[in-house]
Amino acid sequence: MKIAVGCDHIVTYEKIAVVDYLKTQGHEIIDCGTYDNVRTHYPIFGKKVGEAVASGEAELGVVICGTGVGITNAVNKVPGIRSALVRDMTSAIYSKEELNANVIGFGGKIIGGLLMNDIIDAFLAAEYKPTEENKKWIEKMDSLQHASQDQNNPHFFDEFLEKWDRGEYHD
């Protein structure tokens, strides 16, 4: 399976471990970054993963930031993405079987690496089980998404990166 993976600078090592694990399981990885611990902003990498999945370049995605909250919210803003922030297998399986989630999010500083791998395995193995009811839920959720042309601008996040550079954000 082709899987897009992305993170912010706080959890680069955790992302590398996930990428390495997924490769040992035979998956093809699109590593959307970040690649080091240089301060950056999680929406950039959530957007990259979301776009890879929504375009069909990747089948599914994994996003990781310190708590998982920010990057999961960011990836959910990409039209066509249904992402779930999870910390257990039950939630991961539910998100796929009932809501047809195509991206899974983690707090890399909240959850351990071995558990994260187990949850990813459960998510990848789960299959969407369409029903009339969950089709309606998904249709409703998808109708809430509206693409903004501003998002196509490669400088969309520049104002936030400039604030990072000035030290206005703290980890």
Curated annotation (Swiss-Prot):
Entry annotated with the keyword Zinc: no
Gene3D superfamilies reported in the protein's UniProt record: Sugar-phosphate isomerase, RpiB/LacA/LacB
Keyword terms of this UniProt record: Isomerase, Lactose metabolism
Record's keyword annotation contains Transcription regulation: no
HAMAP family found in the cross-reference section: LacB
Pathway per the UniProt entry: Carbohydrate metabolism; D-galactose 6-phosphate degradation; D-tagatose 6-phosphate from D-galactose 6-phosphate: step 1/1
Family per record: Belongs to the LacAB/RpiB family.
Protein name per UniProt: Galactose-6-phosphate isomerase subunit LacB 2
Chemical reaction(s) catalysed: aldehydo-D-galactose 6-phosphate = keto-D-tagatose 6-phosphate
GO biological process: D-allose catabolic process; galactose catabolic process; lactose catabolic process via tagatose-6-phosphate; pentose-phosphate shunt, non-oxidative branch
Domain of life from the UniProt record: Bacteria
EC number, as in UniProt: 5.3.1.26
InterPro entries (UniProt xref): LacB, RpiB_LacA_LacB, RpiB_LacA_LacB_sf
Subunit field text: Heteromultimeric protein consisting of LacA and LacB.
Molecular functions (GO terms): galactose-6-phosphate isomerase activity; ribose-5-phosphate isomerase activity
Ranges in coiled-coil conformation: none
A Pfam family it matches: LacAB_rpiB
